[in-house]
Amino acid sequence: KDGKKIAEASGVQGTIKVPGVKAWTAETPYLYKAFITLKNKQGVSEVIPQKIGFRNVEIKNAQLLVNGKPVLIKGANRHEIDPDGGYVVSVERMIQDIKIMKQLNINAVRTCHYPDDPRWYDLCDEYGIYVTAEANLESHGMGYDEKSLAKFPEYLQTHVERNEGNVKTFINHPSIIVWSLGNECGYGINFEKTYDWVKAYDQTRPVQYERGGYDSKTDIHCPMYIDYEESEKYCKSDGVKPYIQCEYAHAMGNSEGGFKEYWDLIRKYPKYQGGYIWDFVDQGLRDKSPVTGKEIFTYGGDYGRYPASDYNFNCNGIIAPDRRLNPHAYEIQYWHQNVWIKDLDAVNGAFNIYNENFFKNIDDLHLTATIYANGVKLSTVEIPETKGIAPQTTKMVKSDALKYAIAEAESEHGKEEITVNFAFASDGTEPLVEKGQVMARQQFVINEYQFDKVDTPIAATSTKISGKKGKLQNNSSIEVEETNSYVKVSAKRMSVTIGKKTGMIDYLDVDGEPILKFRESMKPEFWRAPTDNDYGASLQKELKVWKNPVMNLKSFDKSEMKDSIVLTATFEMPEVKAELILRYCINAEGEVSVTEKMTTDKAAK
């Protein structure tokens, strides 16, 4: 410890008691160095240095505990891949990956679906990453039922040996807190006996396996891709196993839109302790386009039609092959963050800071608050009162500087949107975390943007407009022209034409300049471009009816309110078993408000 000998033992087996030990965690990765010396009659023949960490892992009260604390697993699955080296990954690239994990508040990794380069575990020990260490077992192609290799006794030795190699090779790494028996191999007697072997050899760690489900031999309930409803159902049950999804929040393409909902549940239920995102990095290889000569990342069919391609399905990472952050990485960083501002009292410049860490304070973070008006920066306030906030505690902070900055912003920009952006930036003392790196951030809206209000009545009495053209009875500044095919409403600089047969805005102009031309109806849009995850679930086929659903106009009504006219179109949508009401409200200022209400048949699919 600190270069000094603190304990010694001799013999083939020995026990050393280390006084005042500093425990290892991913937040505080304190390591000791042990020297194993082999001697013979001639003297010392070999000395092996071994870094070791002291920590305890156990399961109590349906929670996974590290040193007695129910840590949250903010994890990711990581394949060994490099855009230039393929499956050969350098130490420099490994360190870069851990640096990015720290940046994104990722504290755990699952070595999917095989043991990694031994140096990876050394780095996780050194820099602080929890590891679920998985054996190289996957027989996905055989399915999960009767043909699963997990059920055939002749494959028992293979199941045991692969886990034996994994456990015996890496057992001394403190970063490894869970053993994983394999991935997607089905379930059977071979996994039950493999579990028994691992538990007999190493009583210090939990063992998990996904395919067997809750009732199988697994210490952790670790399913994959379970939705919010089923996750909450388990959390409310009397299940006695921690709930940590081994794969979830599939990060392919434009994704992570529902990440918040998972973490709302994780922070609500004690037995729900997180999960491992699928996955960390896009598995593409760097190349040049044969057409443009520009740098591209290749995959699947880029290498010909044989072997069979799964297209871009191996590119489902939080980060790109060259380790640039994909857009959804910032969503993950936010919901993984370990510090939160709560209960902002803008009038008094007061708020609470919650430290979600389990083992360290946040003295290495520097807090600032920046005030914006309509997105324009007004001022930045330094808030030094963040020292001494212990793990899992909340501190109330009051800043006069923040109070006055907010008051000044409201005084000078009262009609604009005013926001306060809090940022916790690193002081650079934590390894691999650069000085100034923002580790946590939050935005609070102090004054919402003031939109001009348009009178949008929910109901109105019908009124008859005599003749083809006339003034609104309650307001002479609104002119209405009606024919058998349309109603045209003009007010100030604007005119809008709504078709009686279409129920849509068919024409719109301002100062005589067409904004929307005839036969270019402004129609409701029920479709968006499919994402990669949509394609993976074939949702673009299942939901294709929504791209251009049939809309049959049932009725078209008009009514008059004070200073406005309301036109209401009601549609029947037989393909999707729904009714749609479009309501157009045009006021004397020439403002058009469009609202829509859809009622669906809940019994229909």
Residue ranges and their predicted role:
Residues 98-104, 108-318, 327:
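Substrate-binding/catalytic cleft of secreted carbohydrate-active enzymes
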Residues 1-118, 123, 128-131, 162, ...:
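Secreted/periplasmic carbohydrate-active enzymes, especially glycoside hydrolases
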